[in-house]
Amino acid sequence: AADAAQLNGTVSLEDYYSGDTASGSRHAMTGRLRLDLTKAGSSEKFAFHFDARQRLDLSGESSTSSKEGRIDQAQLEYAGTSLYLSIGRLWPKDMPIEVVDGVNAFYHGPKTGVGVYAGLRPNPYSQSTTADFTSAGLYLSHAGEKLTAGAAFVHNGYKGDTDRQYFYGYGTWTPIPSLFALGNITADMSPSGEIDLTNLIAELTWRPDEVKSFTFGYNQFRAFKYYASTLFADINDSRQDAWYLGATYRLAQKYTVYGRVETQKRHFPAVESGQNDMLSYRAGVSGDNLFNTGVFLNLSASITDSYDSEYKSYSFDMSRMLGESFQLMVNGAYTENVYGAASSAEVTSFGGSLFYMARRWNMSLGLDREQGADYTTSRILTRVSFNM
């Protein structure tokens, strides 16, 4: 049965270069390795997952360079009929809100499960293993035909003291095929036991048929605090609220007209009242297989009155498959910015990408250029990957 073990993975190398006439150049290379060994052992219930990257900064003077590496995942897991166990650097199963160097246990029935995890929390700045940061949590999850939901309580520590404690919940609901709702919520608990709403996302989409859809949403984001590991635990609360309404309409099975309006309000103690509100409008049209040429085209325009500034932007992007393995993409944009009483600033950008996609090999080359009033930025991004 050991012969049934399966190994999959990806090896990739990415090279990024940007040259800016105002701030100089930047050059970096990133290598990444991802491995997934599944159906291991005589029971075929063991697996090993590994994901790591190494970044080499080549922007230094006199050919000097700096390295930055990190391991995102390195875990050994057992997946039984009802019991799941994992050890290593991991994201808790069905509740990937914290990464830990530790253990995770999850017991589940046909629809509902309960899990617990505990371990060392990687250093948030370097992602290295350290005993200074810790994390533990207890969570529940449910996956039904119409409802999926989860709830968790998380404790983060720093050198033996409480760094952060918070509640987290998420859910999706499809009461009828044409209606879909989603949301998640985070509430932080202070050392004194007070509970404050930190983040809230709620969205409702109504799609009565294959032609049109309407979406309404609300977001709230508040700065949360680390009470032990930073010097800024007494920073004033700041909050940002956003409401948005979007709609799409399909024409002749080829074209889609869409629009979105969004308003935001900031509650920042240090910000003047005239800089607290934002209103944005965006509209566009996209088309598939234009004139039977295989070309996809998207045109959009947006107008934003944002915190004492105004933005107008017009953009396009188009793509076409060249045979079965190549895809060509071209894009461009023009933006006009007005900051208060100052004169307007214009920015023009354009670029293109070429993708090669095969069973095991994927390669891409991307070029773009951005032109402002007093600067020019050019970027080149190349990437090659091999699928095992």
Task: For the regions a language model picked out, list residue spans one by one.
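Gram-negative and organellar
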Residues: A2-M388
